[in-house]
């Protein structure tokens, strides 16, 4: 079952050359990117004592806005995207900046099942895919036992409709009009329900809000609009028993 939304792909293909233009269609992502990177690294360091050999998977990597900064800090990153033009843009940037990133034009469904990662990242992607339940299940399938995942998306609330669509797209023009579809926004409780029968636990929910007075973005406990979800993959009791055998 494919997660690809062809309409969404066409929309992003038109602007895929512009990922690294801080004043372009992805400008808002550049403005929040330092927060996203800091949050990811904070959770990685919180969970792992040794981060030197971690394998990271960035799903729906776009032009490499997450993969590149992580690679620049020494992380081993594999980044995938369904769009060839996104991978081309990301690869060109990596080559220009002497970054080693394993970019692949593929989808989470097509990724080999036995490819497991210490950290799986999927930011601002879920609200653009089809078959979201299967997409999320495929996503967490690639987390190593005792590994973690960090995802972000937009809550389906009246406040999110107001700020995520009306204000962001039509008043302030932070993103192009029709970037988002309110019906595809996802409540945290819906993700929790999808993960109910898995060995994935939600470790933290954290909001990302815009402070109008200071003209800056910051992390918050307000998850009514944008939010991060920090996930952990539990090791089952059988695995623990096997690993404890001398």
Swiss-Prot record:
Any GO BP annotation: methylation
Keyword terms: Methyltransferase, S-adenosyl-L-methionine, Transferase, Ubiquinone biosynthesis
Disulfide pairings: none
EC numbers on record: 2.1.1.222, 2.1.1.64
First-level EC class: transferase
NCBIfam families reported for this sequence: UbiG (TIGR01983)
Entry-linked PANTHER family: METHYLTRANSFERASE, UBIQUINONE BIOSYNTHESIS O-METHYLTRANSFERASE, MITOCHONDRIAL
Family classification: Belongs to the methyltransferase superfamily. UbiG/COQ3 family.
Protein name per Swiss-Prot or TrEMBL: Ubiquinone biosynthesis O-methyltransferase
Gene name of this polypeptide: ubiG
């Amino acid at each position: 079952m494919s997660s690809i939304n062809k309409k969404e792909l066409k929309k992003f293909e038109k602007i895929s050359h512009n990922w690294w233009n801080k004043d372009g269609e992805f400008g808002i992502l550049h403005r929040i990117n330092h927060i996203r990177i800091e949050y990811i690294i904070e959770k990685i360091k919180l969970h792992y004592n040794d981060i030197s050999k971690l394998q990271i998977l960035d799903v729906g990597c776009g032009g490499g806005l997450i993969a590149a900064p992580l690679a620049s800090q020494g992380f081993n990153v594999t980044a995938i995207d369904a769009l060839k033009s996104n991978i081309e843009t990301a690869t060109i940037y990596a080559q220009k900046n002497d970054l080693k990133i394993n970019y692949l034009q593929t989808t989470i469904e097509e990724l080999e099942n036995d490819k497991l990662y210490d950290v799986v990242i999927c930011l601002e992607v879920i609200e653009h895919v089809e078959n979201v339940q299967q997409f999320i299940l495929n996503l967490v399938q690639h987390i190593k036992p005792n590994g973690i995942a960090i995802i972000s998306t937009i809550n389906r609330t009246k406040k999110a409709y107001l700020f995520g669509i009306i204000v962001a797209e039509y008043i302030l023009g932070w993103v192009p009009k029709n970037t988002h579809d309110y019906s595809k926004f996802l409540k945290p409780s819906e993700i929790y329900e999808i993960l109910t029968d898995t060995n994935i636990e939600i470790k933290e929910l954290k909001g990302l809000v815009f402070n109008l007075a200071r003209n800056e973005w910051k992390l918050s406990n307000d998850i009514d609009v944008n939010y991060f979800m920090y996930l952990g993959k539990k090791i089952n009791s059988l695995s623990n028993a096997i690993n404890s055998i001398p």
